[in-house]
Amino acid sequence: MVSTGWSNVTPWKTFREAPEPELAKRLEAMIPANANMSRMVFNFHCPPYGSNLDEAPEIDQDLNVKEAGRSMVPVGSTAVRDAIRRYQPLLSLHGHIHEGKGTARIGKTLAINAGSLYEQGVLQGALVELDPKKGIKSYTLTTG
């Protein structure tokens, strides 16, 4: 498993944000050269750009949500997307974008964002059953 809490730059300017080229270098440095990608899990906080796991409400220059949250835009990371496309791990797990609950396929890789409803006091998660021979046996998104 390769894990990181780093993300691409956001309007919120939080700790552990990096421009896409720097994030790409960080990811490359963490991924072992001879790793067995058929058993590899990427646990990257930021979801891949354009995957539908990264759809968030569009905001204006004053950080206010536009159109009452009806206008959604992709805000994930191109560096994360490119790493998944290049290495094709078995599974990639993501968070960061609370509205991005769901799954996506990027090549052979199953990507999951469990989403978040923490402001409502609701825990969301993903249960993934792995089989040493078959890879991903099953998965379920949970709310509770």
Walk through the language-model features, giving the residues of each.
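Short amphipathic alpha-helical segments and helix-helix/interface helices
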Residues: 28-32, 77-84
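Active-site neighborhood of phospho(di)ester-bond hydrolases with catalytic His/Asp-centered motifs
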Residues: 41-45, 74-75, 84-99, 112-115
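Generic alpha-helix detector with strongest preference for long hydrophobic helices that associate
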Residues: 61-65, 73-74, 92, 109-111, ...
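Binuclear metal-dependent phosphoesterase catalytic core
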Residues: 18, 81-87, 99-144
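Conserved catalytic scaffold of divalent metal-dependent phosphoesterases
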Residues: 1-72
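Active-site metal-binding loops of divalent metal-dependent hydrolases
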Residues: 4-8, 46, 95-97, 115-117, ...
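Short intrinsically disordered, low-complexity coil segments enriched in acidic
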Residues: 1-4, 81, 91
